[in-house]
Amino acid sequence: NPDDVLVTTGSQQALDLISRIFIDPGDVVLAEAPSYVGALGTFHQYEAKVVHVETDDLGLVPDGLRAAIKSVRESGRKIKFLYMIPNYQNPSGVLLPAERRTEILNIARKEGIFVVEDNPYGLLGFDKPSPNAMRAEDSENVIYLGSFSKTIAPGMRVGWALVPPSLKEKLIIASESSILCPSNFSQLTISSYLADQPWRDQIASFCDLYKVRRDAMLESLDEYFPVTAKWTKPGGGFYVWVTLPEEIDTKALMPKAIVAKVAYVPGTAFYADGFGSWSMRLSYCYPTPERIRE
């Protein structure tokens, strides 16, 4: 429904607006373990306590969500929402199966918790289509975030939120108080591009390019990394999540990696509690296959 759409200055602004209207200092936000560093930073700015929810090779674990809710409620704290990236998650690259999405929505609905569904990578699948958006199953309890930053141009800073009617006015007021309105120039540019250009073909070409680079990274990891290391095998998006033996500190290793002209993000950046020191996020979206192998 177009009436449910709130245009934002990228989906990052939508995260800020949601945090502003929901979070009081000390409130709890549930998030996947690991989770997007930009979201964690926003929640921290509003003094939320982030409680990470267990994940596995398929994404967020429903029983882990039940356990996290129970633990937080028993501590007497308030849960304001669950933040998640179900499609090619950042940083893991995992695609959450449809049946888990339904189960997670049922849990959230039963417990009276909003779900913030962040979906910047949903159109960037290589191997199979993404399941339906979680908001398609529950428009009253899911806030859906979208962005053109990963599919058209990050510098345009145009995103959107699909919000329940009960929240839209609050989000509009919060947005007006911070930026007055998103850039009309950027919106008109995006609108014209979508109307006049073969944007679906452009995204398909991106997917073909990223798939080749993803394959090069996975092949290189198989060839060069030790058998004690593990990594995800994403079907889309930008990222591979690597888990090394626990004695390896990826943050301490970073200076040596930079000297060798290798860039990654240490795993601790994706946890609010400093966990994940033996993990790292690798990105294959920019370097060529030759550079990835090098």
Language-model features: where?
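Short hydrophobic/aromatic beta-strand micro-patches
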Residues: 162, 241-243, 283-285
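Conserved core of the PLP fold type I
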Residues: 1-111, 122-137, 143, 210, ...
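Conserved core segment of the aminotransferase class I/II
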Residues: 136-138, 143-208
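Conserved glycine-rich beta-strand-loop-beta hairpin in the small C-terminal domain of fold type I
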Residues: 191, 208-218, 229-243
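PLP-dependent enzyme catalytic core of the Aspartate aminotransferase-like
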Residues: 259-261, 272-294
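Glycine-centered flexible beta-alpha turn that most often forms the glycine-rich phosphate-binding loop
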Residues: 118
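Short, conserved charged micro-motifs
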Residues: 248-253, 290-293
